Swiss-Prot record:
Family of this protein: Belongs to the histone H2B family.
Location of this chain's protein in the cell: Nucleus; Chromosome
Chain positions carrying an annotated carbohydrate: 110
Source organism: Drosophila yakuba
Keywords: Chromosome, DNA-binding, Glycoprotein, Isopeptide bond, Methylation, Nucleosome core, Nucleus, Ubl conjugation
Modification comment: Phosphorylated by the catalytic component of the Dbf4-dependent kinase (DDK) complex Cdc7. Monoubiquitination of Lys-118 by Bre1 gives a specific tag for epigenetic transcriptional activation and is also prerequisite for histone H3 'Lys-4' and 'Lys-79' methylation. Deubiquitination of Lys-118 by the SAGA complex is involved in activating transcription of a large subset of genes.
Molecular-function GO terms, alphabetical: DNA binding; protein heterodimerization activity; protein-containing complex binding; structural constituent of chromatin
Record-listed cross-link Glycyl lysine isopeptide (Lys-Gly) (interchain with G-Cter in ubiquitin), residues: 118
Modification type N6-succinyllysine: residues: 44, 114, 118
Protein name as catalogued: Histone H2B
Subunit record text: The nucleosome is a histone octamer containing two molecules each of H2A, H2B, H3 and H4 assembled in one H3-H4 heterotetramer and two H2A-H2B heterodimers. The octamer wraps approximately 147 bp of DNA.
Amino acid sequence: MPPKTSGKAAKKAGKAQKNITKTDKKKKRRRKESYAIYIYKVLKQVHPDTGISSKAMSIMNSFVNDIFERIAAEASRLAHYNKRSTITSREIQTAVRLLLPGELAKHAVSEGTKAVTKYTSSK
């Protein structure tokens, strides 16, 4: 049999339980990751006087996520075919060439090469 507690002790135990449940009910707000700020920066570089609606931003964010997933999957496949365990810039570049059509692939590769060069020179 559990030990009997006095009336005051039982009330205190009940209050302690209530305080714990109140703090547990507070949910931490999870941060939602998005490319919105980067999409907005590019938009302002290309068309400084143009805005973007939240729905259009959501579509653009989905588009960027989709393209990145496709490039990552293709690069992974290429590394697997060549019996490599590391995805390098070479696999990414080849994946971009395979996924994007013609002139778009050329521009993407040149911009990517420029970004990698800038990053390595800043280190």
